[in-house]
Structure formats: structure tokens, C-alpha cells
A protein has these predicted regions:
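GHKL-type ATPase core
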Residues: 142-228
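Glycine-rich G1-box
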Residues: 121-122
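Acidic ATP/Mg2+-coordinating residue in the GHKL
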Residues: 118
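A generic secondary-structure signal for well-formed alpha-helical elements
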Residues: 44, 48-52, 135, 139, ...
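Conserved catalytic core of two-component histidine kinases
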Residues: 102-104
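Bergerat-fold GHKL ATPase/HATPase_c domain
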Residues: 1-99, 125-132
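Bergerat-fold ATP-binding/catalytic subdomain of histidine kinases
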Residues: 130-145
Length: 228
């Protein structure tokens, strides 16, 4: 068995702790499946809008301050615009769709699978740490997005599934991970048997190595979860 990448423990962003639990109590736990599909589709739309803004700024048609304000503090630092996160060569300038698919008998134990696929900015190394961190958000310093609460794909766990899967491409790197209640397992293996060599990796702030597969595909993200 080929060993995969290392895992990452679940966290709660301290700056947004109260807000997160208020939202979970009032909406997510009461209507988990409709809320999950709505949240994931909204995330996809937000990723597309972020891409459009990044293209405008990178191509000189707009300035960051046209769309973003700069604020600091634990709740806002991750939402400040960072031009180094984006690369025009990897952003899909043609496809702006958010695809929602439902496939029968394709999940673990032959359950059905819902997938939401966007062609936005992708999830790069610096955002991977926020994948399972409740309250983590990159949207609090702009009025151009729907979301800012820091729930994201994590809402899929409220439907009763054991995990959800994220496959994402960011600037030539394809990552894949299974996200559980208390951890995220990065599942691109350390060694690529087809290429006969190790897969490259990035290192997170806590030293976790996350392997990826190099790709020519444009930035995109697919979030999938089982439906019982």
C-alpha cells in the first residue's frame, strides 16, 4: 500500500468562533442537506467572482482597492487581497459555470454522490490549512461575495456522512483530500508509481507535507459528498 500525505487536525478560528456556532445552530443543523447544497453552490459562485476580480486586477483593468478593503486581526487577515495567490496563466478565462451533479451508487457503500464543480481560483497551499478550520474565510474584506462565515465545504459533514472529498487545482498543482469531522487526510501519495518517482509536495506552516500532482489543467475545485 502506497503511503499518502500527512493529515491535518481540525481547528476553529478563534476570531469567528461565536459567529460560526450561531450559524450552525440556526440553519445548518436544522436543514442539513438543502443548506449544504446551497452553501457549496454559493462557494462555487464566489470562487468564480474572485477569479473575475483577480483577472481584472492582474490585467491592469482595476485596482485591489476597487474591490477590497484592508483590515487586520485574526478574523480578517486571511481575507486581505494577496496578488501573489493568482496567476493569469492558470485562471480559466472561458468557463464560468458551477456544475452540480448527482450520481447514483458511486460512493462508499454504493451511496449516491453529490458534487459541486467550479472553475474559480482553486485552493492553494496557503488555503489548505483552512479547509477544516471552522470560521476560516477569505471573503470578509469585500462586498463581492455571498459568503463570509467560514463554513464552506465543511457543512457537508452536517448531513451525516463520515467525510467529504475535495479535489482542487491551483496554479499547476492538483491536490486531493478527504475531510473528516476531526481531521483532513491529504491523499495524493508520496510516490507516483506511474511516473516512477516521488510526487512533489508543499509544506504547511505546522510542517505538514502535502503532496500534489503537477497538471496543465486550469484552476478549479470539486467538492463531493455521499448522500445516504
Amino acid at each position: 500500500q502506497i503511503k499518502g500525505s500527512e493529515g491535518l487536525a481540525k481547528k476553529i478560528n478563534k476570531g469567528a468562533e461565536k459567529m460560526v456556532f450561531d450559524i450552525l445552530q440556526s440553519t445548518q443543523y436544522s436543514t442539513p442537506i438543502p443548506s449544504t447544497v446551497r452553501e457549496l453552490a454559493t462557494n462555487g459562485a464566489d470562487a468564480q467572482r474572485e477569479k473575475e476580480i483577480a483577472i481584472e486586477i492582474l490585467s491592469g483593468k482595476a485596482k485591489a482597492e476597487d474591490y477590497y478593503i484592508e483590515r487586520h486581526g485574526e478574523q480578517y487577515d486571511d481575507s486581505n487581497f494577496d496578488i501573489s495567490y493568482y496567476d493569469l496563466d492558470h485562471l480559466d478565462t472561458e468557463n464560468n459555470d458551477v456544475l452540480i451533479t448527482y450520481k447514483e451508487n458511486e460512493g462508499t457503500g454504493y451511496c449516491d454522490v453529490v458534487s459541486i464543480h467550479d472553475y474559480g481560483v482553486g485552493i492553494g497551499a496557503r488555503r489548505l490549512e483552512g479547509v477544516l478550520e471552522l470560521g476560516y474565510s477569505t471573503k470578509r474584506n469585500t462586498a463581492e461575495n455571498f459568503g463570509a462565515f467560514g463554513l464552506g465545504a465543511k457543512v457537508a459533514l452536517s448531513t451525516g456522512v463520515d467525510f467529504y472529498t475535495i479535489e482542487t487545482v491551483h496554479n499547476g498543482k492538483r491536490f486531493k483530500m478527504n475531510c473528516y469531522n476531526y481531521k483532513t487526510d491529504f491523499i495524493v501519495p508520496a510516490f507516483n508509481p506511474q511516473a516512477g518517482k516521488p510526487n512533489p509536495h508543499v509544506v504547511l506552516s505546522d510542517g505538514t507535507k502535502v503532496h500534489y500532482v503537477p497538471t496543465d489543467a486550469k484552476n478549479q475545485t470539486i467538492v463531493s459528498f455521499g448522500v445516504k
